Amino acid sequence: MKKSTHLLIASILAGCITSCSSGKRIAQHRIVTNPMNLNYRFQPKDESRREAADPVLEYFKGYYYLFASKSGGYWRSEDLAGWEYIPCTTIPTLEDYAPTILPIGDTLYFTTSSGKTQIFKNAHPEKDTWEAVDTKLTYRLHDPAFYSDEDGKVYMYWGCSDKDPIMGVEVDPKDGFRALGEAKALIAHHGDKYGWEVPGKNNEEPRQGWNEGPCMLKYEGRYYLQYAAPGTQYRIYGDGIYVGDTPLGPFEYVEDNPFSFKPGGFIGGAGHGHTFQDKYGNYWHVASMIISVRHMFERRLGLFPVAVSSRNGIYAHTVWSDYPFYIPNRKVDFDKTDLSVGWNLLSYRKPVQASSSLAGYEPGNANDEQIETWWAAQTGKKGEWLQVDLETPMLVNSIHVNFADHHFKVFAPHPPVVYQFFIEGSADGKKWMNLFDERENGKDEPHRLFTLDKPVKVRYLRICNAKEMDGCFSLSGFRVFGKGEGAAPSKVTGFRAIRDSEDKRIFRFTWDAQKGATGYVLRWGTQKDKLTHAVTVFDNQYEARYFNRDSEYYFSITAFNENGN
């Protein structure tokens, strides 16, 4: 499969656009959004659905290599924007969950969760030529994570349990990764103190969550041990940090946890991730994102810029990460930018029509900003269509097309699942112009962002199926981005944050509904000038149970609409 087949650009367009946030020209193929647009594999059993999760990503010999659970292979990229899929048959444990990789010298090492630990290596991972290492590490690893320190010492971390702690041990890569000493318990469960560790859709269940998916990052001489909680099936799945002065601790809880967290927006979840540096020195976090409708493990991958500094600590930019943002080709200060290109969502709950629909899968599900719901036509025949009315002509920059694979009967192994379609725009609903023509498409891209070379002013947008399909033509998101021509909402009034008197992990928020607002961004942090966490809310009230019991918090709220915020 050629690398060019995975570039996230419209094949009929090329060139650059100007970012509204930076004022700089950005190549189209570097404008992306979440979930990552990968050829997510359908699983071999149960209800037909795609899955990828528990990602790990490292830069090795000029390429980024991305591995994820249940993917039948892995991906590589030169720029974090376009991805080439590499099917893999030479790693017999590839189908086990939670892979980890480690570059040492000219070799990339791999292992995963399995009954008996087995490590593999490959000096040329662009080829499926992995070889087994004579593995001497005897611990049974669940959610393993390699880490190589600057002094050449190598460590293994692991843990995936609602009872057992996150563990760690030094290993010897020159002797089959044999453990050097006894493993140490590093992170225990504390759901009684840290609300975000409590399971449930809103952290409401009276039991311990799962602490899992560790990852180690070193910054300015200190060791940041990351872990995920409380469960992969929840939008409130996130990653937190403990910090210490040595690779095996002792570690202290970071008060501003979780550092990677995305409970709201089109797609939620930002847990069981891996933090890495790109070739320019920028930090990124790749993590699991959640659908969990057809199966608890129905998941996708997300990529988030991460700010790392001695002043502000570590935090991932997530709240606007399912809007268009750009992949930089230079060093960037992520304390000053989240890489957004400045386009607003124009399509939220606008009038929608369709050629047909199934009960429970009405057209409005395609623009309700919930990937968990979708529109499904009655058939997969050519000519099924969905149309959105922006209600007034607006400048459109991009369209995010998310296919839902409704009533598909696809199971691994399978050839690429290819959609063919075209997207039209109209100012009056009568005369239509072709914006994107994918009638000859040969790529498996279920979450593609289409970006125009120059914005077009249209009121109506329509996507039409052009290929006979065995299931139903279906969309979990037909999302239109650009610039409205009206006014942004006014400052939010009547904001109140009330802490529960009996359970201080819980806050309840209310505010006055603002005229013309699409939604609101609620921000918080443990320092007044450091509100690094955020959630998108489409109502004027919100309950959150993911706070620390003993921490004090500061909050702010802003309204947004199609004209800005």
Region spans (language model):
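Trp- and acidic/polar-enriched beta-sheet ligand-binding modules for extracellular glycan
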Residues: 381-382, 409-485, 545
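Short beta-strand segments within Ig-like beta-sandwich modules, predominantly Fibronectin type-III
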Residues: 439-442, 533-539
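Beta-strand-rich modules
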Residues: 546-564
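C-terminal motif of bacterial Sec signal peptides marking the signal peptidase cleavage site
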Residues: 18-19
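Pro/Thr/Ser/Gly-rich low-complexity, intrinsically disordered linker/stalk tracts
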Residues: 481-515, 549, 564-565
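Disordered, acidic Ser/Thr/Pro-rich linker "stalks" and the adjacent N-terminal cap
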Residues: 327-393, 402-416, 437, 479-494, ...
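Extracellular low-complexity, O-glycosylation-prone stalks/linkers
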Residues: 516-534
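Beta-rich carbohydrate-recognition and catalytic domains
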Residues: 23-206, 218-265, 280, 288-333
